UniProtKB/Swiss-Prot annotation:
The chain crosses the membrane at residues 8-28. It comes from Acorus calamus. It holds the Pfam family PsbJ. This is Photosystem II reaction center protein J. Keywords: Chloroplast, Membrane, Photosynthesis, Photosystem II, Plastid, Reaction center, Thylakoid, Transmembrane, Transmembrane helix. It is found in: Plastid, Chloroplast thylakoid membrane. GO terms for cellular component: chloroplast thylakoid membrane; photosystem II reaction center. Its main location: plastid. InterPro entries: PSII_PsbJ, PSII_PsbJ_sf. Belongs to the PsbJ family.
Length: 40
């Protein structure tokens, strides 16, 4: 493992940033299939 002292690992940034994005896209498509896409 490389020394990441004072630095934030890129995989951590990707995970933290990716979860809300994937969740938002998932909710958007779920709402569209449920007929609630217009409310978004």
């Amino acid at each position: 493992m490389a020394d990441t002292t004072g630095r934030i690992p890129l995989w951590l940034i990707g995970t933290v940033a990716g979860i809300p994005v994937i969740g938002s896209v998932g909710v958007f498509f779920y709402g569209s299939y449920s007929g609630l896409g217009s409310s978004l």
